[in-house]
Amino acid sequence: MLSEQTAASGSSSSSRGADDREIVISTGREIVVRSSGGEEREEEVVVEEELEEPEFRDIHALSPPPTPTPSQPSSSYHRRRRESWESAAGSRHTSIRSVGSDTAPSELFPTMSREFSAMVAAAANANAAAAAAANGGDSSRAGVDDALGRIGEDELEETNPLAIVPDSNPIPSPRRAHLALPAPGDVSSAGGGHGDEVSVGQVKKEEVESKIAAWQIAEVAKVNNRFKREEVVINGWEGDQVEKANAWLKKYERKLEEKRAKAMEKAQNEVAKARRKAEEKRASAEAKRGTKVARVLELANFMRAVGRAPSKRSFF
């Protein structure tokens, strides 16, 4: 850039000079070849490139927005204010792009957000309000409040989600109807401050009652949950015991069945053995009877043949 231009101008001027010179330009340096008296000499001149310094742009506060007048509606005022913010932001982005166009992409300035511009405007309005505090103007204070409202600095956030806030329009319940409606004599005798004290006391009492009710519900739920866990454990133990008893009974029944089968088999064997022995004894007795009867018949035939009467003594 600048070094090349200076080198080019130097080469044009040197070509028109008295001495014959030849200039060779390379990146970052300049080589000059001089010839004097038939003798050539090379000179190397280092040309330092001028470093481009980035241009920085100061950030100034935006002009404070005009306060809305009673004749102008609030919607049109907010619309014009938003358009002014967008136009200011667009011009700021354009200027930053024009400044950073010649520089490297890493040297571009980051753009400001809309919230930051709103904070800058609020700071400017606050300074203007501090300067005009001696005059006692309310419009500057309204502008500051409006600016703070735009960025949400004056909004109070609830940090305790479990906080109990008294209702402005409570619905009277049948249980607390007698507390909410005082007697006519009390109303006539009590003043405004006493009524406020009664309402504050009632609110505190309701708060205490609500806390007690919540504690009661939580404790009852804990007891019920503990009982359910114990009931589950007891049911499991009962099931185990019943299962063990049924298993023992079935095992004993199996043993009894085996013993019964063995006893029945033994009894059947004994019966068969007794019957077999009885048959044997019966057969032997029948044989003895037949033998004796045959002997008696033989003796009777012999006596009949001989003709002799039997004696009184028997053979048996």
UniProtKB/Swiss-Prot annotation:
Ranges of compositional bias, category Basic and acidic residues: 143-153, 277-287
GO cellular component: plasma membrane
Pfam families: Remorin_C (PF03763)
InterPro entries: Remorin_C
Expression induction: Induced by abscisic acid (ABA).
Source organism, top-level taxon: Eukaryota
Compartment list: Cell membrane
Reported tissue expression: Expressed in roots, leaf blades and leaf sheaths. Expressed at low levels in stems and spikelets.
Segments of skewed composition (Low complexity): 125-135
A molecular function GO annotation: signaling receptor inhibitor activity
Any Gene Ontology biological process: negative regulation of brassinosteroid mediated signaling pathway
Record's keyword terms, sorted: Abscisic acid signaling pathway, Cell membrane, Coiled coil, Membrane
Membrane topology qualifier: Peripheral membrane protein
Annotated spans, Disordered: 1-108, 125-202, 267-287
Listed Polar residues bias regions: 92-104
Subunit structure: Interacts with BAK1.
Note: Plants over-expressing REM4.1 are dwarf, with dark-green, short and wide flat leaf blades, short panicles, spikelets and grains, narrow bending angle of the lamina joint, and short leaf epidermis cells.
Function summary: Functions in abscisic acid (ABA) signaling downstream of BZIP23. Acts as antagonistic and negative regulator of brassinosteroid (BR) signaling. Binds to BAK1 and inhibits its interaction with the BR receptor BRI1. Inhibits the formation and subsequent activation of the BRI1-BAK1 receptor complex.
Protein name as annotated: Remorin 4.1
Origin species: Oryza sativa subsp. japonica
Gene for this chain: REM4.1
